[in-house]
A protein has these predicted regions:
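Short, surface-exposed amphipathic charged segments that create phosphate/polyanion-binding patches used
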Residues: 45-52, 126-134, 174-176, 221-223
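A short, acidic, amphipathic alpha-helical segment used as a generic capping/interface helix at domain edges
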Residues: 80-81, 167-180
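Conserved mixed alpha/beta catalytic, RNA-binding, or beta-rich assembly cores of soluble enzyme
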Residues: 92-101, 105-142, 148-152, 156-172
Length: 223
């Protein structure tokens, strides 16, 4: 049976992207789901938290708590997960995060789809530079970095923020700001199909759901 590794920057659960990926790849693929924060104690989780001056990433723990994590502190944890997957015979893995991570070490024999690279190229494919692009991120402090990246790519950017683990009302209100955009990118793997549908309806705009894009590409590359 083919194996597909799914690397969460939080703790491995079946609540987030796993059902979507399963629907896309079918039942003939073994999903090897592991989280960078798997097995960490509350003390270790506190040590991995983002500092005030850092650009954090938001993820969910197995118990449903939402946490803000330091990207540099995640890198060795992600590398450990990748090494374990390669040792277990996984040949294709997806890093289920749209953030950038410096210092990733990809084991020999393992192909890694990085969420950031995949989603940025998907945006370019569906929305030409110069167009008005909506960018939805979990936290207000993420707007400057994510929005700035797409501005540098040539887009007129409209940013909004709504925690994917927060209320649907918050998301719906935020989505109104995207009316008139050529497309919206959900710039976090925590956003699911229900989030995409809310944004599409409220903003009357086509929406790129990051985890679904990753799943479809992975399905084409499985070997």
């Amino acid at each position: 049976m083919k194996k597909l590794g799914l690397v969460s920057i939080g703790q491995a659960t079946d609540r987030d992207f796993v059902p979507i990926i399963r629907e896309i790849v079918g039942n003939d693929v073994e999903l090897v789901v592991r989280g960078a924060l798997d097995g960490l104690t509350d003390v270790q989780l506190a040590e991995a938290a983002a500092g005030e001056a850092e650009h954090p990433v938001v993820t969910e723990l197995a118990d449903g708590r939402s946490v803000r994590v330091s990207k540099p502190k995640l890198v060795p944890l992600i590398n450990s997960v990748l090494s374990g997957m390669a040792a277990d015979g996984v040949r294709l893995a997806c890093l289920m995060c749209t953030g950038s991570f410096e210092g990733l070490e990809i084991p020999e024999g393992l192909a890694l789809l990085e969420g950031r690279r995949v989603i940025d190229h998907a945006v370019l494919a569906v929305c030409p530079p110069g167009a008005r692009l909506g960018v939805l991120v979990p936290l207000k402090e993420q707007e400057a970095l994510s929005g700035g990246k797409y501005r540098a790519m040539g887009y007129e950017v409209v940013c909004g923020h709504a925690n994917p683990y927060g209320s649907r009302e918050e998301l719906s209100a935020c989505a109104e700001t995207f009316r008139g955009c050529a497309a919206v990118v959900l710039h976090c793997m925590g956003y699911l199909r229900e989030h995409r549908d809310i944004v599409a309806r409220a903003g009357n705009v086509p929406v790129l759901e990051a985890n679904a894009v990753m799943g479809h590409l992975a399905c084409e590359l499985l070997f």
